C-alpha cells in the first residue's frame, strides 16, 4: 500500500482505458506489491461535486473507503458523480450496491446508438456515510 504521483496514476489509467484523460484531475492509485492494481481519477471539481472514474479488477471496500474519505472529508463535496456506458452491465449492478442512485440518462453521450448512452449515477454524502455505517457492523 502507498501513494503515487497523480501523473503516474493518470498514465497507467490512460493505458488501461486506451484513451487520453484531458481534464484537470486528481488521482488515487491502489497498489499491491508496489504495482498499481486499480485507479480512481477525479475531475470536474465544482466545490460541491466531483466526477469519478475507476479502473481495476474490482473495487474493494478498502479502496471505496479511501474514495469516500477523499471526496467527502478532504474535498468537502456533497456529491460524487459517475457516468458509465449503458453497456457496462457489471458497473450498473455494482453502483446501487455502493449507495449510488441513477439520476439521469444522457442520450448518445458516448456514441450514436442507444448502447452508447451515459447513465448518470450520484452518491450523496449522506448515502456514503450510511454505506460506511452498514459496512462497519
Predicted regions, residues:
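Short amphipathic alpha-helix that is part of the acyltransferase structural core
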Residues: 1-18
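Conserved beta-strand-loop-alpha-helix junction that forms the acyl-donor binding cleft
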Residues: 82-92, 109
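Conserved GNAT acetyl-CoA-binding A-motif
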Residues: 73-84
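Conserved acetyl-CoA-binding loop-helix of GNAT-fold acetyltransferases
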Residues: 59-73, 89-97
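Conserved acetyl-CoA binding element of GNAT-fold acetyltransferases
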Residues: 45-57
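Conserved beta-hairpin
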Residues: 24-38
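Short hydrophobic/aromatic beta-strand or adjacent loop that forms the aromatic wall/cage
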Residues: 25, 116-120
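Conserved catalytic-core motifs of GNAT/GCN5-like acyltransferases
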Residues: 101-116
Amino acid at each position: 500500500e502507498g501513494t503515487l504521483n497523480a501523473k503516474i496514476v493518470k498514465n497507467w489509467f490512460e493505458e488501461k482505458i486506451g484513451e487520453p484523460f484531458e481534464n484537470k484531475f486528481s488521482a488515487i492509485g491502489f497498489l499491491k506489491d508496489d504495482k498499481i492494481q486499480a485507479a480512481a481519477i477525479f475531475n470536474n471539481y465544482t466545490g460541491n461535486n466531483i466526477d469519478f472514474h475507476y479502473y481495476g479488477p474490482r473495487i474493494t471496500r478498502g479502496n471505496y473507503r479511501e474514495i469516500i474519505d477523499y471526496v467527502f472529508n478532504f474535498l468537502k463535496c456533497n456529491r460524487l458523480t459517475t457516468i458509465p456506458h449503458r453497456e457496462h452491465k457489471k458497473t450498473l449492478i455494482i453502483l446501487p450496491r455502493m449507495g449510488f442512485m441513477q439520476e439521469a440518462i444522457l442520450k448518445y453521450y458516448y456514441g450514436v446508438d442507444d448502447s452508447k448512452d451515459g447513465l448518470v449515477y450520484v452518491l450523496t454524502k449522506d448515502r456514503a456515510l450510511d454505506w460506511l455505517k452498514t459496512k462497519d457492523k
